[in-house]
Swiss-Prot record:
Stretches that traverse the bilayer: none
GO BP field: mRNA splicing, via spliceosome; spliceosomal complex assembly
Function summary: Component of the 17S U2 SnRNP complex of the spliceosome, a large ribonucleoprotein complex that removes introns from transcribed pre-mRNAs. The 17S U2 SnRNP complex (1) directly participates in early spliceosome assembly and (2) mediates recognition of the intron branch site during pre-mRNA splicing by promoting the selection of the pre-mRNA branch-site adenosine, the nucleophile for the first step of splicing.
Protein name: Splicing factor 3B subunit 1
Compositionally skewed regions (Basic and acidic residues) per UniProt: 169-178, 234-244, 294-307
Length: 1307
């Protein structure tokens, strides 16, 4: 409307125009009179339909519709809520479907925390048992037994070494391009000298020694054909502990050095660490035809016919489970292509039970390629396979062909069965089956449904009987327990195996009582079970990749216990045990390392030195560094167990080995580990050990030189401060070495010199320090982190010796030291940080605090917080050691200014800054007075900060500086701080509240009760509700503060308030922390002293009725403390009266209180002994064991307290009540009774006790004699001299004079 209508015509025209526009509008856009608002559609919803938001149609098929459009429309209509900005919401990690809220609380598996180096232990193979040369009186073993001797093991070790070298040569040739593909005999004869005679182990499988046709070598085949898995490798004999040479999951082919399989017991068939016999391959024993066979592979005729004479794996299923743990962890580099022979032995174990599958042991792919898997196979299936198998089983069960009997029952009479047409073949469509069966088992053709199949409706995944829960990871080890069998039908070996399995399952997964019983049983029956069956089951469990710390601890404990019992029977299994236990020696967990040492120590004592040396000798020059490292550590443990002298000849031979540098390296490492492990115990043998390894310092191998220097360093560290004369012979080569070497070698030589210098006399130390310092200063700028650590350590050691002057350090060492080491990156690595701080503190001890602090004080204002922390920690340690005497006024100002800045700028939560601030302020003492207002201003400002951490640090700082404020007479300032802290007692963060209470406690301690502001009468009622707080820090600080007030200022508070506090204190007796319970109990004593014992005692006696034992025990202690504080006569009447209550807990509590009471009051008990005797008579005759136990404890404390006060009559009376309890079997009761008898021996003398004893010492019953001799022995130990006069008289006979007349002399 451009203009306002004024005439009638204009108005009419305008109306028509508006109506026209309205008609043109969409009807939906209009707003009705009673419809929902148009502009507020997003609030109220603009739709009239009552069906809005509902799904209006359902999909015809069973799939869900896409409802996105509907749901989004519905969400658009909802009212907008008030919530945080989207950016903040996106920062919060949303939980996914896979999120496990309990993941962090689950016990971590050992495998999860292992680095790549430690994971090599899972590649180790548990070796077969070896021959015990000492068995049968050292007779020569029967060659038919094929026992593995030391010679066999060394030969296999040699072959493995040669194999690795050849592989390396091939790899180098391939790299350089010299490796050629050779086809045909002519090419091969051209490549090789024709006349050279092959050794027989260089011949391929199908060649005879006589004829040597030139054929492509197996190595060339392996290299030339990528992805080809050779079926029979000549070196497959010993995969050894080689580092990734063999894929543990792959099964090696036939080998040249196969022992004859037919005589091998099943338990032997565990592939070994450098000892794998060829017959371990399942399937190669006769079921497969190898690509190449040679005459060594020929086996007795019966092999194919009788399953029992096959390979060790096929005889008794899973007798030796050595391969299980290895096969199940595939090597990351394993070949992608897998043949069915590559299956792990573990997964085939289930099918090797001849009872359940007819014919020979099946070798096909387990579980999924079998019509009816055996229970063992079922356990090796994945959950998906198991589910598919169950479904198929159900379908087969429903659709199975009906039998004639069932058809007869269904149809009326008169029907007859028609024969099928000639040539009719029923349709078989295995593709439709969920799990197809490609090959019939055991040579049986056609359809075969075992009858057992119908009875076994489903296989339980938990063992029956009283056995603990089986985890999914455990099934492969304990699967036999899932099959219910009649044990009487099993052979003795199988029964034994099942028994061991049950006991191990109880130990691993059972409850503590179940575990205890099983552990005792397996220990007692260890010799009966035998070493082989036990270790064949325990060791694979220990190699399991899913093992947890607690489980490993329990299994190691089992080994420890059975070692004692088995003793020399363990010899053939020493190497097996070492393979599993040696990795514990390099575990990051200290307790695991201790357990490993303990096992190896006991093993050495059981097996003897000769067995240990012959077992571990092949591993000393193993190609794998991991094996050599763990072997060296194990040898050190053997040396500590059997004595260093017994091992010295062997070590001398190993360290001087000319054959391999690896042996020399390991021998010297053994010496180093002995020094680390045994410490100063090496001193008697120091010269011998140094002589053994000194030649290593000039060895041609760099690694040997390095380890020799490190071993010298370890020996010197262990011998400190003695033994410099033993190192005379190595000083010259070390001295030459530090001038010749660079890098790691130099670092090791410097370390050795660094440990030798502190052993020297002052003038020698000074000379050597000056000489070595030139090289050290040169190495200050080395970029190598390891070198830096060693240089810092050596500087610290050199500067710590007496002969080095402060002047020399100031001029020569300090400038380059601070230039190269006090840098930001040194603060980032924790080990460098620690070493730098320690070295700087050592330098300060020589040159004075001011010299060092003046160089680093400005760095307190550095922008890098980690660097500031390092500076602060150094200053704190220097001032803690040397004080602030040589710090001048200017440096003092810089120090306070820098510390305040660093304190305010800190963002991390550790206490370095706090400790540093406290140490510096306390060291400065009165000199800090001018800075106190500034410090307190900072503290008050930070107490008001919004960050809880900042408030906590401010409160902690008050508690650190309160003593200095008192020294500076700043009581007014402290009073002000007290008021401010009182106002902050409403703090909601428990950590901060605990710190505030700690600060109040510190102020109360130094300012005293009467000057305290706020006054105590206002402060204590404010603390009472805080006692309810369940946070340990709050509880501890609060109860300490209340106890201090109760001790020193009880008169400022009304008795009613103290009683209220008493009731709150009862709850604190339940605290987990012992310090809180102890403070609470003491506070009861202070309160009783302040307001009298009666009210407090009434509260405590009521608390004896509670169920919780810890609460009752603490209550009894509190009662005893009240008695001690307020004299026993105030407490005893009420206590003895309480004993009348016919309730077990109360009576036991009273007796316990009496026990503590007489323990605390000591000789004051002489006045009360007659009063409590009737009560003790009743308790000692009670049927309840605990009554008699506690009453015996009372008698013990009472008798020890009243010794020499003439109360023997009463004690003798009580002895008559105690004595009948000597035959109790409960360990707790007998311990209390023996304690009472010990106390009575002291109080009434050994004479009376011996008179009681004599009647039973020669009793006809052994049980009686045992008890009486035990009592007599304890009397004898305690009063040996006093007994002489009281032995019974034995009169002289014709030959002997027994009477000692001098004992009858009287003066």
């Amino acid at each position: 409307m451009a203009k306002v209508a004024k005439t009638h015509e204009d108005i009419e025209a305008q109306i028509r125009e508006i109506q026209g526009k309205k008609a043109a509008l969409d009807e939906e856009e209009g707003v009705g009179l009673d419809s929902t608002g148009y502009f507020d559609q997003e609030i109220y919803g603009g739709s009239d339909s009552r069906f809005t938001g509902y799904v209006t149609s359902i999909a015809a098929n069973e799939q869900e519709d896409d409802d996105d459009d509907v749901s989004s429309a519905t969400f658009e209509q909802k009212k907008p809520g008030y919530h945080a900005p989207v950016a903040l919401l996106n920062d919060i990690p949303q939980s996914t479907e896979q999120y496990d809220p309990f993941a962090e609380h689950r016990p971590q598996k050992i495998a999860n925390r292992e680095d790549e180096y430690k994971q090599q232990r899972r590649k180790m193979i548990i070796s077969p048992e070896r021959l015990d040369p000492f068995a049968d009186g050292g007779k020569t073993p029967d060659p038919k037994l094929n026992a593995r001797t030391f010679k066999d093991v060394m030969q296999e070790q040699y072959l493995t070494k040669e194999e690795r070298e050849i592989r390396q040569q091939i790899a180098e040739k391939a790299k350089s391009g010299d490796l050629k593909v050779v086809n045909g005999s002519s090419a091969s004869s051209a490549a090789q000298p024709p006349s050279k005679r092959k050794r027989r182990w260089d011949q391929t499988g199908d060649q005879t020694p006589g004829s040597t046709p030139k054929k492509l070598s197996s190595w060339d085949q392996a290299e030339v054909t990528p992805g080809h898995t050779p079926s029979s490798l000549r070196w497959d004999e010993t995969p050894g502990r080689a580092k990734g040479n063999e894929t543990p999951g792959a099964t090696p082919g036939s080998k040249i050095w196969d022992p004859t399989p037919s005589h091998t017991p099943a338990g032997v068939a565990t592939p070994g660490r450098g000892d794998t016999p060829g017959h371990v391959t399942p399937g190669h024993s006769g079921a497969t035809s190898s690509a190449r066979k040679n005459r060594w592979d020929e086996t007795p005729k019966t092999e194919r016919d009788t399953p029992g004479h096959g390979s060790g794996w096929a005889e008794t299923p899973r007798t030796d489970r050595g391969g299980d743990s290895i096969g199940e962890t595939p090597t990351p580099g394993a070949s992608k292509r897998k043949s069915r022979w590559d299956e792990t032995p573990a997964s085939q174990m289930g099918g090797s039970t001849p009872v359940l599958t007819p014919g020979k042991t099946p070798i096909g792919t387990p579980a999924m390629n079998m019509a009816t898997p055996t229970p063992g196979h079922i356990m090796s299936m994945t959950p998906e396979q198991l589910q598919a198998w169950r479904w198929e089983r159900e379908i087969d069960e429903r659709n199975r062909p009906l039998s004639d009997e069932e058809l007869d029952a269904m149809f009326p009479e008169g029907y007859k069965v028609l024969p099928p047409p000639a040539g009719y073949v029923p349709i078989r469509t295995p593709a439709r089956k969920l799990t197809a069966t490609p090959t019939p088992l055991g040579g049986l053709t056609g359809f075969h449904m075992p009858t057992e199949d119908r009875s076994m409706k489903s296989v339980s995944d938990q063992p029956s009987g009283n056995l603990p829960f089986l985890k999914p990871d455990d099934i492969q080890y304990f699967d036999k327990l899932l099959v219910d069998v009649d044990e009487s039908t099993l052979s003795p070996e199988e029964q034994k195996e099942r028994k061991i399995m049950k006991l191990l399952l109880k130990i691993k997964n059972g409850t503590p009582p179940m575990r205890k019983a099983a552990l005792r049983q397996i220990t007692d029956k260890a010799r009966e079970f035998g070493a082989g069956p036990l270790f064949n089951q325990i060791l694979p469990l220990l190699m399991s990749p899913t093992l947890e710390d607690q489980e490993r601890h329990l299994l190691v404990k089992v080994i420890d216990r059975i070692l004692y019992k088995l003793d020399d029977l363990v010899r053939p299994y020493v190497h097996k045990i070492l393979v599993v236990i040696e990795p514990l020696l390099i575990d990051e967990d200290y307790y695991a390392r201790v357990e490993g040492r303990e096992i190896i120590s006991n093993l050495a004592k059981a097996a003897g030195l000769a067995t240990m040396i012959s077992t571990m000798r092949p591993d000393i020059d193993n190609m794998d560094e991991y094996v050599r490292n763990t072997t060296a550590r194990a040898f050190a443990v053997v040396a500590s167990a059997l004595g260093i002298p017994s091992l010295l000849p062997f070590l001398k031979a190993v360290c001087k080995s000319k054959k391999s540098w690896q042996a020399r390296h390991t021998g010297i490492k053994i010496v180093q580990q002995i020094a680390i492990l045994m410490g100063c115990a090496i001193l008697p043998h120091l010269r011998s050990l140094v002589e053994i390894i000194e030649h290593g310092l000039v060895d041609e191998q760099q690694k040997v030189r390095t380890i020799s220097a490190l071993a010298i360093a370890a020996l010197a560290e262990a011998a400190t401060p003695y033994g410099i004369e033993s190192f005379d012979s190595v000083l010259k080569p070390l001295w030459k070495g530090i001038r010749q070497h660079r890098g790691k070698g130099l670092a090791a030589f410097l370390k050795a010199i660094g440990y030798l210098i502190p052993l020297m006399d002052a003038e020698y130390a000074n000379y050597y320090t000056r000489e070595v310092m030139l090289i050290l200063i040169r190495e200050f700028q080395s970029p190598d982190e390891e070198m830096k650590k060693i240089v810092l350590k050596v500087v610290k050691q050199c500067c710590g010796t007496d002969g080095v002057e402060a002047n020399y350090i100031k001029t020569e060492i300090l400038p380059p030291f601070f230039k190269h080491f006090w840098q930001h990156r040194m603060a980032l690595d924790r080990r460098n940080y620690r070493q730098l701080v320690d070295t700087t503190v050592e330098l300060a001890n020589k040159v004075g605090a001011a010299e060092i602090i003046s160089r680093i004080v400005d760095d307190l204002k550095d922008e890098a917080e980690q660097y500031r922390k390092m500076v602060m920690e150094t200053i704190e340690k220097i001032m803690g050691n040397l004080g602030a005497a040589d710090i001048d006024h200017k440096l003092e100002e810089q120090l306070i200014d820098g510390i305040l800045y660093a304190f305010q700028e800190q963002t991390t939560e550790d206490s370095v800054m706090l400790n540093g601030f406290g140490t510096v302020v306390n060291a400065l003492g009165k000199r800090v007075k001018p800075y106190l207002p500034q410090i307190c201003g900072t503290v008050l400002w930070r107490l008001n900060n919004k960050s809880a951490k900042v408030r906590q640090q401010a409160a902690d700082l008050i508690s650190r500086t309160a003593v200095v404020m008192k020294t500076c007479q700043e009581e007014k300032l402290m009073g002000h701080l007290g008021v401010v802290l009182y106002e902050y007692l409403g703090e909601e963060y428990p950590e901060v509240l605990g710190s505030i209470l700690g600060a109040l406690k510190a102020i109360v301690n130094v300012i005293g009760m009467h000057k305290m502001t706020p006054p105590i009468k206002d402060l204590l009622p404010r603390l009472t509700p805080i006692l309810k707080n369940r946070h340990e820090k709050v509880q501890e600080n609060c109860i300490d503060l209340v106890g201090r007030i109760a001790d020193r200022g009880a008169e400022y508070v009304s008795a009613r308030e103290w009683m209220r506090i008493c009731f709150e204190l009862l709850e604190l007796l339940k605290a987990h922390k012992k310090a809180i319970r102890r403070a609470t109990v003491n506070t009861f004593g202070y309160i009783a002293k302040a307001i009298g014992p009666h009210d407090v005692l009434a509260t405590l006696l009521n608390n004896l009725k509670v169920q919780e034992r810890q609460n009752r025990v603490c209550t009894t202690v509190a009662i005893a403390i009240v008695a001690e504080t307020c004299s026993p006569f105030t407490v005893l009447p009420a206590l003895m009266n309480e004993y009348r209550v016919p309730e077990l807990n109360v009576q036991n509590g009273v007796l316990k209180s009496l026990s503590f009471l007489f323990e605390y009051i000591g000789e004051m008990g002489k006045d009360y002994i007659y009063a409590v005797t009737p009560l003790l008579e009743d308790a000692l005759m009670d049927r309840d064991l605990v009554h008699r136990q506690t009453a015996s404890a009372v008698v013990q404390h009472m008798s020890l307290g009243v010794y020499g006060f003439g109360c023997e009559d009463s004690l003798n009376h009580l002895l008559n009540y105690v004595w009948p309890n000597v035959f109790e079997t409960s360990p707790h009761v007998i311990q209390a009774v023996m304690g009472a008898l010990e106390g009575l021996r002291v109080a009434i003398g050994p004479c009376r006790m011996v008179q009681y004893c004599l009647q039973g010492l020669f009793h006809p019953a052994r049980k009686v004699r045992d008890v009486y001799w035990k009592i007599y022995n304890s009397i004898y130990i305690g009063s040996q001299d006093a007994l002489i006069a009281h032995y019974p008289r034995i009169y002289n006979d014709e030959k002997n004079t027994y009477i000692r007349y001098e004992l009858d002399y009287t003066l």
